Amino acid sequence: MSVSNPPSSGKPLKLRVNKDSEGYLSLVTESGEVYKCPICGNDKFVYNYERGEAVCIVCGAVVQEQLLDLGPEWRAFTSEEKGQRARTGAPLTRLISEALTTVIDWRDKDVSGKELDIKRKLEVIRLRKWQTRARVQTSYERNFIQAAQELERLRSAMGIPRPCIEQALEIYRQALEKELVRGRSVEAMAAAALYMACRMMKMPRPLDELVRYTKASRREVARCYRLLLRELNVKVPISDPILYISRIAEQLKLSGEVVKTAIDILQKAKKAGITAGKDPAGLAAAAVYIASLMHGDNRTQKDFAVAAGVTEVTVRNRYKELAKALNIKVPVK
């Protein structure tokens, strides 16, 4: 049975998309009827990915707008080939591997927040004990779990994207396998791995900002970072100061015009060769500071220093260098 939806109908049909072996679409209504083109009666369509439209292959009529193709982009002709190309299934992440199971909460309360009675409380204590025994077996697993929990805490506190945490866990795993963690604190190694991961993913964070959220000192984290660089033979790209601009502007609620001007300033500074050997966060803070002054936003250098995680002196020095080299006439407020 088939149905066609005339162009003049008031309420559009909700259509389900099927894709055949040739790559053509067939549209099926909620009642299971095959949808046909209202112009020529054809039942095969192609999908316009740029516009999200289903187009008839015979007459070219757009039969459905804002259509979401939820199927795979690949084609398979056998069930074996389909299984090989499928990418669905449970997400495999570093955060749920290596015995990283759930934890029974230490607060003896039920789902509504009420205290458990004494009998139930003793039962939960016993279950928690066995959960801990069954969850972790080796020192390797215990160490890795501590690092994963520390990285998850840093992610929550600093708002770091999850891909950076995944990369940091991979770096920490390599350090564990090479026994680089022995004799060093988990907090320092985890922070160093996260600092490296953020730079590798081109989402850098200043080291001073990272240190504010961890128990380890700046010296410990820097030492562990140099150790990871040396022993893991990891190529970390040089941080581009432009990557810091959006975060600084977001924290200070600056306009898009200020961001664009700051990017232009740093691009000119790169061409002039005055960015080499300078702290990228300090350069970004100075560029955003200059751009904000040019657009009439007279905030203090301290505001930009705090947002970038650098000192006020650094912002002032980088400001003077940029203003002099690029001949920018903006007075210091």
UniProtKB/Swiss-Prot annotation:
A zinc finger (TFIIB-type) spans 33-64. One of its GO terms (biological process) is DNA-templated transcription initiation. One of its GO terms (molecular function) is DNA-binding transcription factor activity. Zn(2+) binds at C37, C40, C56, C59. InterPro entries: Cyclin-like_dom (IPR013763), Cyclin-like_sf (IPR036915), TFIIB (IPR000812), TFIIB_arc (IPR023484), TFIIB_CS (IPR023486), TFIIB_cyclin (IPR013150), Znf_TFIIB (IPR013137). Keywords: Metal-binding, Repeat, Transcription, Transcription regulation, Zinc, Zinc-finger. Stabilizes TBP binding to an archaeal box-A promoter. Also responsible for recruiting RNA polymerase II to the pre-initiation complex (DNA-TBP-TFIIB). This is Transcription initiation factor IIB.
